[in-house]
């Protein structure tokens, strides 16, 4: 039976084994997917052992996405630009392909929620690894503009410069944004995990916009609660992005795209128990 794994530290909280087990059942694939705690300085050894034992592919979560980027012998274009890898696949020639499916997971979840991105103005909050991983797939949807904002403006400017060849992307200081100019706001910061807000002006929120928080929790996230209370038309958390990036990884490994909607519904139910 083909074996797959997710590496992380910590890893006990990972929903990936649950998601991929449902995907395998849905698509009648004979495969096993487990979670493995890798030592903080031991990703390479853990990956070596896994692939040497016949492993076919793995997902990578914090803090190993940059280690996985270095580990891969080949990189997809989106992984190169993301500077991080969340999916590894053993190739027939023995090489290891590194890919990043996070951004596609985000886009697929937005589309599943009937959020149109073509011709829209998108504000991306944050300029860390989570933001960098989603910019290329967002630009591929042809928004009229993607603005990156961050507390440290220079980081946002660096990302805007990196992705400028791929679409209309710019940067802005977070304290200069005070007009309701955006159709979609995506929060890529992890501030909400500790109940914090990213520091946006309330005047950005309007009734016909979508606010998306890339983190998720059993209850509404701090960012989405803030946006909803200010009258945002739709708020979405990152649970669907988690399922979407998993579906993209599954497609890379097995050549079949599983359906996300049913798995997301089941995952949401378990999260709220």
Curated annotation (Swiss-Prot):
Protein name: Shikimate dehydrogenase (NADP(+))
One GO MF term attached to the UniProt entry: shikimate 3-dehydrogenase (NADP+) activity
Gene transcribed to yield this protein: aroE
UniProt-annotated catalytic positions: 65 (proton acceptor)
Binding positions (NADP(+)): 77, 126-130, 150-155, 214, 238
A GO biological process held by the record: amino acid biosynthetic process
Reaction catalyzed: shikimate + NADP(+) = 3-dehydroshikimate + NADPH + H(+)
GO cellular component: cytosol
Family per similarity comment: Belongs to the shikimate dehydrogenase family.
Pfam families: SDH_C, Shikimate_DH, Shikimate_dh_N
SUPFAM superfamilies: Aminoacid dehydrogenase-like, N-terminal domain (SSF53223), NAD(P)-binding Rossmann-fold domains (SSF51735)
